[in-house]
């Protein structure tokens, strides 16, 4: 079966950000077609939740593709339309099991031109561990 898939090219106009592609539930064929459509519009391809099998297929197609295995993300091209902001975002993960999601968030922010800093495994069960990062995260004004 070949279901229609559509990329939201108007998202940048509405939100200032290009759409990320959720790779987990898409076939290799769908990811290939979506990537080709996005590249044809001179936009960056950002695929999240992609496994190594799908990523390796796209890496073979696109020499300038980069796979970030720990984040389960693949990027093809460069974002030439980054946000112009001096804001900084802190990304805080409670445990090491959150690493992939933390790295995905960091990649997304970096692609869009947002300065960020990740704090990995700060602990949520022990308040003393989280509080020890307060002096680093408060100046950011944005915490994920």
What annotation goes with each model-predicted range?
Residues 25, 50-52, 72, 95-96, ...:
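Short, ordered loop/turn segments at secondary-structure junctions
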Residues 37-40, 52-54, 74-86, 97, ...:
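N-terminal loops that bind phosphate or other acidic moieties
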Residues 90-126:
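Glycine-rich phosphate/diphosphate-binding loop of Rossmann-like nucleotide-binding domains
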